[in-house]
């Protein structure tokens, strides 16, 4: 009997394996046959292959979904076409009209096409659209967390239309082959799959065209359905991206005076994208306008001893950056602050990838990492080189080289060289490494004012030469119920990355992470996990820096709510030569989307923390809060108020080291998928400054944009003379028109 059971199990496993990788060979259609209007017409998709989405992968584990979905895929010489019919009660469909890459789209009903055009799991290109055809695209890489895995700054050009119909909704995609990276050749074999997100009793349901293995740590490797395409026409892109812009600014020179305006400041620049072949692209930008359309969300840094990192929003620097992402902070594109000219070469072959970037930076950022503090200065002009090469040895291993150089105009340099690797030993085990060393000569400059010392080296920039190194090793294991990793980090006292982001060094750091996870798939408990993370940190001088143990709990429950709780217990901690014991605090995260109309994001910390920026740091009572509800009033209008609050109180005197808040309010009206108007205001009690930013934007594709707006804010210098919450002391108006021209 046992033999029959074993045979039956083997047969079942083989059937699942075969089902897990299907092959689709659609017939080639004619462009004139398909009209992208969001309505699937009879005869329109007669050349297509039909694909059923038969697997609910979350919260169910590869079970048959209640929601039925059919997809149709075909192609022409120059485009890939996809249509999806998602059956549903129209009244229960969640969707709003959104601008491109609005992250709120992931809370909608949507459909998603995953493409692994190199069929090797290096990355996936994700093309999403909701029921109104609003788009979000991203690139996914093999990473441990969603934050590291998805890059939503990545952009592809594609066309979508969506319509809500009597039995659900329909979405049609038209994707130019010229916008998709893939290997050379007119005949292609890609990997792909299709996903639909639906909602059942308020809970998001992940439905796919192929099964998903929760025990496999490589999510992008599980895009394995084959798509066979023949005799494509490979079009090389030659694109020009000119822009014109203008700004008018002014400010008060005394508290009770009128605003005095400067002269209008016109500007112009040019970008160029040139396909050398299907795998290689050369990009050039001359006098680029890298001003941000929307202000960064202000972070509270009053109790931070190091510089804070902000996300990259500039499209030129975002393209191709998945190949230069490092755990050791070796590359940070925002360190290239204000380039006058920059060039970039990207090549993606079947077995290798290359990335080469040059820039003439007019206002260089200079950052020094210390054992407990970082030091940041604004410098002068420098020339930057970044080179990255990666070799894909086989499906389960890849290795690479990296170098970056920054040469300062008036002397000094920073060179960084390194190697890295990624190895998959089995479905459950993965090993990664990063090794770097730097050679530096400081400029002689007054960019940083500090009398501090880093061992035998002064923080002041006086031409000193030094060398440093960094090592990062990680062993990772993932099964159906256990997720674990062990990592080692080694940063020497003089490790510095002049084109990177390194804020702490002089540490040898070991981390052990071990978590149990389960998917009960119950109405009140779809997922839960609990575990621990332990850290042990020594310096290069062999004295103990920190011992820390975290308790971690996570669960998904009613009302589409995810709750994460962490207790961070610093058993021992050394800061600026002083020892502290039993410093513990809690962190609570709550993310809830109970309906299409309401979303809630909450982060709260409470417990003990150090007053890091006091002359003599002491332990205080900490409380901080971030709360942001979202209100989707209709399909086009959204309100997003938020508050960030932070307080640290002396345990003995009960006096506050600091106590303040940043309140922010955003209202957006989306006329259609390309045109919106929004208003952002913010008041910061730490600096006692107020600003308001109105903006109108038209953005029909990732590169073409027109916007007009302004910034109005108060100046804290005048607060004592004339205090008013909504006072305007400084103002700026700006507009920009940038248009993509294909040649």
Regions found by a protein language model. Name each.
Residues 20-391, 400, 411:
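Structural preference for beta-rich elements and adjacent junctions enriched in aromatics
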Residues 388, 418-420:
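Contiguous, well-ordered alpha-helical segments that form the cores/surfaces of helical PPI scaffolds
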Residues 44-46, 89-93, 135, 146-148, ...:
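A short local loop/turn or secondary-structure capping micro-motif enriched for an aromatic residue
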Residues 338-340, 346, 414, 422-425, ...:
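Exposed, low-structure sequence patches enriched in small/polar residues
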Residues 233-264, 314, 364-383, 388-391, ...:
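Primarily recognizes Gram-negative and organellar outer-membrane beta-barrels
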Residues 1-25:
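Bacterial Sec-dependent N-terminal signal peptides
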Residues 176-180, 406-407, 517-519, 682:
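Short beta-turn/strand-loop junction motif enriched in small, turn-promoting residues
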């Amino acid at each position: 009997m046992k033999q029959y059971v074993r045979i039956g199990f083997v047969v079942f496993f083989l059937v699942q394996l075969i089902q897990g990788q299907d092959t689709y060979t659609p017939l080639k259609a004619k462009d004139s046959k398909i009209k992208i209007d969001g309505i699937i017409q009879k005869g329109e998709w007669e050349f297509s292959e039909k694909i059923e989405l038969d697997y609910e992968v979350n919260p169910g584990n590869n079970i048959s979904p209640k929601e039925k979905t059919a997809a149709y895929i075909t192609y022409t010489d120059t485009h890939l076409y996809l249509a999806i019919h998602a059956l549903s009660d129209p009244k229960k469909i969640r969707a709003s009209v959104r601008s491109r890459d609005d992250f709120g789209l992931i809370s909608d009903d949507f459909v998603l096409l995953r493409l692994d055009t190199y069929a090797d799991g290096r990355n996936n290109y994700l093309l999403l659209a909701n029921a109104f055809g609003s788009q979000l695209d991203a690139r996914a890489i093999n990473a441990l967390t969603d934050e590291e895995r998805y890059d939503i700054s990545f952009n592809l050009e594609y066309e979508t239309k969506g319509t809500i119909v009597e039995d659900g909704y329909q979405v049609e995609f038209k994707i130019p082959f010229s916008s998709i990276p893939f290997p050379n050749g007119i005949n292609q074999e890609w990997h792909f799959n299709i996903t639909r997100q639906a909602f059942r009793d308020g809970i998001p349901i992940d439905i796919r065209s192929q099964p998903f293995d929760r025990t496999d740590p490589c999510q992008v490797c599980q895009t394995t359905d084959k798509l066979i395409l023949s005799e494509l026409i490979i079009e090389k892109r030659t694109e020009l991206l000119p822009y014109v812009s203008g700004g008018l600014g002014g400010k008060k020179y005394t508290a009770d005076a009128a605003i005095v305006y400067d002269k209008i400041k016109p500007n112009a620049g040019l970008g160029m994208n040139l396909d050398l072949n299907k795998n290689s692209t050369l990009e050039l930008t001359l006098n680029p306008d890298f001003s941000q359309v929307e202000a960064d969300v202000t972070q509270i840094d009053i109790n931070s001893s190091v510089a804070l990192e902000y996300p990259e929003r500039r499209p030129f620097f975002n393209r191709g950056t998945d190949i230069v992402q490092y755990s050791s902070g070796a590359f940070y594109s925002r360190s290239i602050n204000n380039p006058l000219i920059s060039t970039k070469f990207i090549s993606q072959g079947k077995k290798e990838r290359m990335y080469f970037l040059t820039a003439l930076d007019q206002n260089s950022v200079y950052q020094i990492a210390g054992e407990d503090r970082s030091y940041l200065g604004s410098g002068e002009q420098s020339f930057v080189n970044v080179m990255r090469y990666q070799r894909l040895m086989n499906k389960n291993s890849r290795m690479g080289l990296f170098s970056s150089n920054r040469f300062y105009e008036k002397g000094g340099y920073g060179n960084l060289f390194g190697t890295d690797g990624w190895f998959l030993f089995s479905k459950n085990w993965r090993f990664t490494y990063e090794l770097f060393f730097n050679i530096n000569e400081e400029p002689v400059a007054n960019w940083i004012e500090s009398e501090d010392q880093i061992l035998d080296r002064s923080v002041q920039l006086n031409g000193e030469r030094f060398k440093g190194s960094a090592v990062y090793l990680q062993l990772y294991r993932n099964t159906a119920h256990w997720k674990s990793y062990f990592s080692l980090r080694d940063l020497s006292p003089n490790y510095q990355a002049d084109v990177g982001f390194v804020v702490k060094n002089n540490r040898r750091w070991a981390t052990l992470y071990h978590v149990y996870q389960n998917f009960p798939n119950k109405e009140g408990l779809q997922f839960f996990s609990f575990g621990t993370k332990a850290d042990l940190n020594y310096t290069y001088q062999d004295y103990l820096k920190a011992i820390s143990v975290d308790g971690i709990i996570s669960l998904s429950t009613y009302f589409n709510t995810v709750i994460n709780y962490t207790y961070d217990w610093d058993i021992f901690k050394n800061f600026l030569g002083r020892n502290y014991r039993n410093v513990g605090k809690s962190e609570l995260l709550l993310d809830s989307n109970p309906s299409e109309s309401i979303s809630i994001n909450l982060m709260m910390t409470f417990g003990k923390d150090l007053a890091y920026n006091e002359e003599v740091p002491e332990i205080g009572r900490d409380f901080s809060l971030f709360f942001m509800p979202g209100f989707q009033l209709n399909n086009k209008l959204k309100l997003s108020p938020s508050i960030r609050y932070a307080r640290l109180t002396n345990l003995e005197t009960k006096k506050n080291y600091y106590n303040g808040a940043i309140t922010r309010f955003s209202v957006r009206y989306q006329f259609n998928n390309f045109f919106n108007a929004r208003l952002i205001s913010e008041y910061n009690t730490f600096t006692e400054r107020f600003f308001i930013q109105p903006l109108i934007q038209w953005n029909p594709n990732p590169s073409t944009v027109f916007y007009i707006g302004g910034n109005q804010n108060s100046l804290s210098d005048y607060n004592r003379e004339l205090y008013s919450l909504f006072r305007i002391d400084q103002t700026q108006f700006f507009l920009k028109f940038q248009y993509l021209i294909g040649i």
